[in-house]
């Protein structure tokens, strides 16, 4: 059940996670030293925040409570979250607010494009909340944002991180036709966790979505990510890798799950840096072009640098195949 938030009266007190309010508080584990990050205080961070606020934009960096916000914003990197800040899903791991979203902001595509140009981004990541309330799941809005960025900053490469467009016929095809450079859709966790961690989604639908992207455009880079520390077994992670390689996914990210509040799914374990390195080694052996695996890895962390490495890895693979 999703409790409807008051989107009419802006002064009304908003409960960020109404669907989780009835849950008992979970234990919060002390973070190990390898998880700790510095508080964001730099000039670059302040400048990025000012640009975001000026254009009335939402970032997943803020809404999801990303631990890398200080580092990324200092470098003028930000992941823009389109279609509002209220999601129609209620995933147990996510800090984004749940409820009934507002109407789409028709000026948002141009505002995002202006911010991208002002920040001088060579690579931009665009994500969104789930919009199950929209007939196309927000596909047309994604398309408009991509077009606006192309018009304002033709040299900027575009990476999108999309919802699953569950039960939205034609939505995926429309987004792929807009020609983003990277199509990312996160699996989030292993299939055995879906009922408790990602109840509104379907594991094999997400695998099929990524596979379908390659069928529609074999040249488009595809990417997916998972969190570990949610009680998964190692063999489940390895099977997920196999499922993604069957779908011809190019890039895999693996990061540590961090619990936003006591009402969210608890951290079952803190995976060690050595274990992350092991996952990276195995993933490369399975054929991924790029793997980012570390405690603080997130989907869009170092996205620009990773895109350059991803493109180079494909070129190297093609050259080796031609020899």
Curated annotation (Swiss-Prot):
Chain residues that bind [4Fe-4S] cluster 2: 87, 91, 94
Protein localization: Cytoplasm
InterPro entries assigned: Aldolase_TIM, Elp3/MiaA/NifB-like_rSAM, LIAS_N, Lipoyl_synth, rSAM
Matching PROSITE patterns: RADICAL_SAM
Ranges of residues in domain Radical SAM core: 73-289
Catalyzed chemical reaction(s): [[Fe-S] cluster scaffold protein carrying a second [4Fe-4S](2+) cluster] + N(6)-octanoyl-L-lysyl-[protein] + 2 oxidized [2Fe-2S]-[ferredoxin] + 2 S-adenosyl-L-methionine + 4 H(+) = [[Fe-S] cluster scaffold protein] + N(6)-[(R)-dihydrolipoyl]-L-lysyl-[protein] + 4 Fe(3+) + 2 hydrogen sulfide + 2 5'-deoxyadenosine + 2 L-methionine + 2 reduced [2Fe-2S]-[ferredoxin]
A single Gene Ontology CC term: cytoplasm
Chain residues that bind [4Fe-4S] cluster 1: 61, 66, 72, 300
Transferase in keyword set: yes
Cofactor(s) this protein cannot do without: [4Fe-4S] cluster
Molecular functions per Gene Ontology: 4 iron, 4 sulfur cluster binding; lipoate synthase activity; metal ion binding
TM spans (from-to): none
SUPFAM superfamilies, sorted: Radical SAM enzymes
Keyword Coiled coil belongs to the record: no
E.C. no: 2.8.1.8
Cofactor binding, note field: Binds 2 [4Fe-4S] clusters per subunit. One cluster is coordinated with 3 cysteines and an exchangeable S-adenosyl-L-methionine.
Keyword terms, alphabetized: 4Fe-4S, Cytoplasm, Iron, Iron-sulfur, Metal-binding, S-adenosyl-L-methionine, Transferase
Pathway: Protein modification; protein lipoylation via endogenous pathway; protein N(6)-(lipoyl)lysine from octanoyl-[acyl-carrier-protein]: step 2/2
Pfam families: LIAS_N (PF16881), Radical_SAM (PF04055)
Family (UniProt): Belongs to the radical SAM superfamily. Lipoyl synthase family.
Protein's recorded name: Lipoyl synthase
UniProt organism field: Rhizobium johnstonii (strain DSM 114642 / LMG 32736 / 3841) (Rhizobium leguminosarum bv. viciae)
